């Protein structure tokens, strides 16, 4: 491989860097076809065109450069940054995913010893952190699609690798979401297919725990998905309407407050069944969840999500009540209290929500009244403060006016001086009287 020096750019390469920032994909494609353009050329800071495109959030440019052979793991930047680090810093989830799929290494550190995930966390790009932490290379899954050793057939049929990889790399661990992903794919929504999938999940879990660099987080995630698969198998065996019954069971709330008890129990059960009792992560989860009564915060789902995906709980975003998807924005038109991603999730949850919708509506109206009352009181208090300040300023102005008037009148000042002299003389007499006769030195 020819060594590329920093800053030694041809005119066409300089134009390429400009086009990445301000031009079109077509212009970049034309320049990349030139013999004078090296796809991995370095500017004076050691940045490649791919790094520029990643940092500027140009997804199509990144895909174009990767198709032309851009090195996703180039490490020539003056501070040791990689294309994945720039993608994570930009906060673009799609570009971060593209870099990972192209083979970007996640454990490379920069000059201050930070990985791409740590850099993203430092600048508050938590979605990118979650994507990086939950990424699982497709090659590692494809290993199970080929017969190994004395096996006559692979442990995982090749046709299941794609759908299974989608579930493995999801950042949403809500059990309803996982069941929905299974249900929407006919290849997965069969008992035989799920049997093979959950066994592969268990093998990956075991490998994560027994390898030299133990990965407890990935092992716990694989085990959790395996437990959901096994629950789906049980419902496919016993019920004719397939997985719809399981989804309803997971969403059904108790009469008092609508809390999904069955969902909480399934998540707690899956954590309890983790086969490696000595794992630090398992002990942390148990300590966090065990003292909490079912129905209280934190829920098992929130604790598990934070442990596996690294999502922070204090971020002010809304989650779908049905599937737990982040960024839901559609509210129930009646109660305004429950949020969904789309109409499908709303219809799925309606059987449970309709029982408490009226009560939630009353709570919402009460909250609105209290908020309006508090706002009016705050406005009244601010008006009183303004009025009192005005009165105080008026009094201060009056006092200043009087002082000025006294200073302007010379007679008053002379009389004041005389009075002060007389008072001083009187004070001297009082002092002499108080002292009394003195003993002379003679």
UniProtKB/Swiss-Prot annotation:
Its main location: other. Residues 401-421 have a biased composition (Basic and acidic residues). GO terms for cellular component: cilium. Residues 401-442 are annotated as: Disordered. Pfam families: Ank_2, zf-MYND. It is found in: Cell projection, Cilium. It comes from the Eukaryota. A zinc finger (MYND-type) spans 320-357. Disulfide bonds: none annotated. Zn(2+) 2 binds at residues 332, 335, 353, 357. GO terms for molecular function: enzyme binding; zinc ion binding. Zn(2+) 1 binds at residues 320, 323, 341, 345. ANK repeats lie at residues 45-74, 79-108, 159-188. Keywords: ANK repeat, Cell projection, Cilium, Metal-binding, Repeat, Zinc, Zinc-finger. Interacts with the retinal-specific guanylyl cyclase GC1. May be involved in the trafficking of signaling proteins to the cilia. This is Ankyrin repeat and MYND domain-containing protein 2. The gene is ANKMY2.
């Amino acid at each position: 491989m020819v060594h590329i020096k920093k800053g030694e750019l041809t005119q066409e390469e300089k134009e390429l860097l400009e086009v990445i920032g301000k031009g079109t994909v077509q212009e970049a494609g034309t320049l990349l076809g030139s013999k004078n353009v090296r796809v991995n050329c370095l500017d004076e800071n050691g940045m490649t065109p791919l790094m520029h495109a990643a940092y500027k959030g140009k997804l199509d440019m990144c895909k174009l450069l990767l198709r032309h052979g851009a090195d996703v793991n180039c490490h020539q930047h003056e501070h040791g940054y990689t294309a994945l680090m720039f993608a994570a810093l930009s906060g673009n989830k799609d570009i971060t995913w593209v870099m990972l799929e192209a083979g970007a290494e996640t454990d490379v550190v920069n000059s201050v010893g930070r990985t791409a995930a740590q850099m993203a966390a430092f600048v508050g790009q938590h979605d990118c952190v979650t994507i990086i932490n939950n990424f699982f290379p497709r090659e590692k899954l494809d290993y199970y699609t080929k017969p190994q050793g004395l096996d006559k057939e692979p442990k995982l049929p090749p046709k299941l690798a794609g759908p299974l990889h989608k579930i493995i790399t999801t950042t949403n661990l809500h059990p309803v979401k996982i069941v929905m992903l299974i249900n929407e794919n006919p290849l997965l929504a069969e008992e035989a297919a799920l049997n093979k999938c959950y066994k592969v999940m268990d093998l990956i879990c075991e490998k994560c725990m027994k390898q030299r660099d133990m990965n407890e987080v990935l092992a716990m995630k694989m085990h959790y998905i395996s437990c959901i698969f096994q629950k789906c198998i049980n419902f496919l065996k016993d019920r004719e309407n397939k997985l719809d019954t399981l989804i309803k069971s997971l969403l059904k709330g108790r009469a008092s407050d609508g809390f999904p008890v069955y969902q909480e129990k399934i998540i707690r059960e899956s954590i309890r069944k983790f086969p490696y009792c000595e794992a630090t992560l398992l002990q942390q989860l148990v300590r966090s969840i065990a003292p909490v009564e079912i129905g209280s915060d934190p829920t098992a789902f929130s604790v598990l999500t934070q442990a596996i995906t690294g999502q922070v709980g204090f971020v002010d975003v809304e989650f779908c009540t049905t599937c737990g998807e982040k960024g839901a924005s559609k509210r129930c038109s009646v109660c305004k209290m429950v949020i969904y991603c789309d109409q499908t999730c709303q219809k799925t949850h309606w059987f449970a929500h309709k029982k408490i919708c009226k009560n939630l509506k009353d709570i919402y109206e009460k909250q609105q009244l209290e908020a309006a009352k508090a706002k009016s009181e705050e406005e009244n208090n601010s008006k009183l403060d303004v009025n009192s300040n005005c009165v105080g300023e008026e009094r201060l102005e009056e006092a200043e006016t009087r002082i000025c008037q006294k200073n302007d009148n010379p007679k008053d000042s002379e009389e004041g001086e005389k009075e002060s002299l007389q008072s001083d003389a009187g004070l001297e007499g009082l002092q002499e009287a108080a002292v009394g006769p003195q003993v002379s030195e003679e």
